[in-house]
Swiss-Prot record:
PROSITE patterns according to UniProt: G_TR_1 (PS00301), G_TR_2 (PS51722)
Localization per record: Cytoplasm
Cross-referenced InterPro entries: EF-G-like_DII, EFG_III/V, G_TR_CS, P-loop_NTPase, PrfC, RF3_C, RF3_dom_3_sf, RF3_GTP-bd
Descriptive protein name: Peptide chain release factor 3
Name of the gene this protein is made from: prfC
Organism (species): Shewanella denitrificans (strain OS217 / ATCC BAA-1090 / DSM 15013)
Length: 527
């Protein structure tokens, strides 16, 4: 067995971020293939296909062919042990995605090289900026007609404010895509189409001036490549590890995930350069991965991962020390010690009990309603990890039951889904309405679908006159009580019983903020 320090050194924990349809799920498949976690990559096919992608395991995801929940997968690659967190890339991803990014040490940004920087990528990059997360970039779909690679890199630099350092460079594109030149290894790796479902035997030509290169790709294309590379090397940044680790520079790889080409080059870079498990801040001190006592935080809760078991699993990022099966942990918020002997490890839907886990690893704890997002577990020290946020929703609906007798099941379902971070639920102080808030429209559909399939509750939405929500705080109890009394028509409790101001319009919110200067109206709430 390796010692704790060595176990930490070999771990890399990262998430994949992208715009919908940039090829994130396909890349996840291919990454797992290289890690030998799955033998035949289950490419994301049309809905009729039996071969569903391994990381899209929830029923709704299988139906739609999109990733709705965050899957967690661990696999070995060369001398490292990689923890990959797959995030929803679809239009309406939820806070789940934001919070997943608090549990990783680096990110892989997947860009469709035909389209360049897209809206969702911008939003996700903003989140990675909050913690200066190191970013590796994969320009995907080079086997299709793509934009000029230099132009796409310029767009990344200008729009995402991060310097680009090309590590590989594409040779041709679309039907004439011949492979990539690796700037650091001074070699050309040739592409063979039609082998996307398996590990390829690759042909490599050493050196840019090698006559073999002219034979392999044709002298015209070889000459064009040499000229292009002169320009590229002159006009782009060189890779600098320090700038990468600060989140200021991204190494760029080109390839095709569907054709299973270039993914291994990116994985080589990730395992070589991405940081090992990093320290995390608590309210009192920084905890490093080399601290000997165990600690970890909950960043996600997933209900009904296994319909046979009707269970809920809390996902924990291990920050320090070592988890051992049967160990006693202190659940800080609750103030109780718990013995954990059945923590889980995952490859998307396939679960097995974990014997031990180290910093950087993600483990699943069975949750019977006692664990919340943001909870800290230690070996006794009263710590609370910070930086795991709730965001004020941007869309609201009133939810109604088709069968009024199922109010109890509806409430239970909504509270559990809210604990997961899929949506937020608000209960107004002055009436019995239930208001659901979400970051995007898809979340509403997801909730109604899951209420029906997992809780046997049929519900419908109605429009409601709510523009935004803010969590309210006031140090002066008397002033808070007066505020509650006078504004009760606009106040509600969220799933965690936190007082929330539900504003019908922005004008109304601004007026209330002026009227009650001692009350803080917050857009985000620390868990």
């Amino acid at each position: 067995m390796l010692g704790n320090h060595a176990e930490v050194d070999i771990r890399r924990t990262f998430a994949i971020i992208s715009h919908p349809d940039a090829g994130k799920t396909t890349i996840t498949e291919k990454v797992l293939l290289f890690g030998q976690a799955i033998q035949v990559a289950g490419t994301v096919k049309g809905r009729g296909s039996k071969q569903h992608a391994k990381s899209d395991w929830m029923e709704m995801e299988k139906d739609r062919g999109i990733s709705i929940t965050t899957s967690v997968m661990q696999f070995p690659y060369k001398d490292c042990l990689v923890n990959l967190l797959d995030t929803p890339g679809h239009e309406d991803f939820s806070e789940d995605t934001y919070r997943t990014l608090t549990a990783v040490d680096s990110c892989l940004m997947v860009i469709d090289a035909a389209k360049g920087v897209e809206d969702r990528t911008r939003k996700l990059m903003e989140v990675t900026r909050l913690r200066d997360t190191p970013i590796i970039t994969f320009m995907n779909k080079c086997d299709r007609d793509i934009r000029d690679p230099m132009e796409v890199m310029d767009e990344v630099e200008n729009e995402l404010k991060i310097a680009c350092a090309p590590i590989t460079w594409p040779i041709g594109c679309g039907k004439s895509f011949k492979g990539v030149y690796h700037l650091h290894r001074d070699e050309t790796i040739l592409y063979q189409s039609g082998l996307g479902h398996m590990m390829q035997e690759v042909r490599i030509v050493k050196g840019l001036d090698n006559p073999e290169l002219d034979k392999a790709i044709g002298s015209e294309l070889a000459e064009q490549l040499r000229e292009e590379l002169e320009l590229v090397i002159g006009a782009s940044h060189e890779f600098e590890l320090a700038a990468f680790l600060k989140g200021e520079l991204t190494p760029v790889y080109f390839g095709t995930a569907l054709g299973n080409f270039g993914v291994d080059h990116m994985l080589d870079g990730l395992t070589q350069w991405a940081p090992k498990p990093q320290p995390r801040q608590t309210e009192v001190r920084e905890v490093t991965s080399l601290d000997s006592d165990f600690s970890g935080f909950i960043f996600k809760i997933q209900a009904n991962m296994d319909p046979k078991h009707r269970d809920r699993v809390a996902f924990m990022r291990v920050v320090s020390g070592k988890y051992e099966k049967g160990m006693k942990m202190h659940h800080v918020r609750v103030g109780k010690d718990v013995r954990i002997s059945d923590a889980l490890t995952f490859v998307a839907g396939d679960r097995e009990q974990v014997e031990e886990a180290y910093p950087g690893d993600i483990i699943g704890l069975h949750n019977h309603g006692t664990i919340q997002i943001g909870d800290t577990f230690t070996q006794g020290e009263k710590l609370k990890f910070t930086g795991i946020p709730n965001f004020a929703p941007e869309m609201f609906r009133r939810i109604r039951l088709k069968d009024p007798l199922k109010q109890k099941q509806l409430l239970k379902g909504l509270v559990q889904l809210a604990e997961e971070g899929a949506v937020q639920v608000f209960r107004p102080l002055d009436n019995n309405d239930l208001i659901v808030g979400a970051v995007g429209v898809l979340q509403f559909e997801v909730v109604v679908g899951r209420l029906k399939s997992e809780y046997n509750v049929e519900a419908i939405y109605e429009a409601i006159n709510v523009s935004t929500a803010r969590w309210v705080y006031c140090k002066d109890e008397r002033k808070l009580e007066e505020f509650r009394r006078k504004c009760s028509v606009n106040l509600a409790l969220d799933g965690g019983n936190n007082l929330t101001y539900i504003a019908p319009t922005m004008v109304n919110l601004n007026l209330s903020m002026e009227r009650y200067p001692d009350v803080a109206f917050a857009k985000t709430r620390e868990n």
